[in-house]
Amino acid sequence: MLERLSGHTRLTALLAAPARHSLSPKMHNAAYAKLGLDYAYLAFEVDNSGLAAAVQGMRALGICGANVSMPNKQAIVPLLDELSPAAALAGAVNTVVNTDGKGHLVGHITDGTGAIRSLAEEGVAIKDQIITIAGAGGAGTAIAVQLGLDGAKEIRLFNRKTATFKQAKQVLKGINAKTSALASLQDLADDRAFRRSIAESSIYIDATGVGMKPLEEHSLITDPALIRPDLVVFDLVYHPAETKLLAFAREHGAKKVMNGLGMLLYQGAEAFKLMTGEDMPVAYIRELLCRNKE
């Protein structure tokens, strides 16, 4: 990498805490090298207490873009100059672009785009579909927003009645006001409503994190009656590659089961495009990530 650095090298970054575990530097730097782009991507350990200074640093240093992860996705919103339609609806940002190099910072959210591109790659269309999502955290609500913007018929979000539930209610209010989709939020503890929603949906998305450590032996769906051959089962967890949910769905006849690796790739590819104007070599990066897991 050192031989690629010059006085013209442009900097992109990750602002998160923790940041050191992230796959983003590996993905972006590998893509820069593959395409011969004079960019470098660094991870910075930044929480809410240092976020305003970090954003001001982006302006002062001409950093051309940054990914934003926990705990900064919502806290960064008032520090920016402009939001994309999806970010405005979600009330959260995971990508910031310094559009003119002079400090005009625009916030985007690419999680939803990543999920929908991953579905499209598997031949799954979302237009005019009824979709159930379990989990109303950042990923779940971002996906709900993009589903609404891209023409889903109904989006049924389920979550426990925590602080996240109240925040999600505001996001869904915006989806109903700004898109043609009918978006609703229900208590995940209401098993009857949850089962009925899955039965009426063509796509089930699990955005809860159940299935990854330390809950790798758990699944929200344990009744084979909920699994149909035509139900798409999409678990955002990508490690392990096959969660308890996906194994159960496959065993009981679901023909289309998907993990979150494609979403990880495509949300990163969307951020890469926003920051550089170039298309990320997705197939190359997918192979790199798969090798890294072995």
UniProtKB/Swiss-Prot annotation:
It catalyses: shikimate + NADP(+) = 3-dehydroshikimate + NADPH + H(+). GO terms for biological process: amino acid biosynthetic process; aromatic amino acid family biosynthetic process; chorismate biosynthetic process; shikimate metabolic process. The active site is at 73 (proton acceptor). Its EC number is 1.1.1.25. SUPFAM superfamilies: Aminoacid dehydrogenase-like, N-terminal domain, NAD(P)-binding Rossmann-fold domains. Belongs to the shikimate dehydrogenase family. This is Shikimate dehydrogenase (NADP(+)). The gene is aroE.
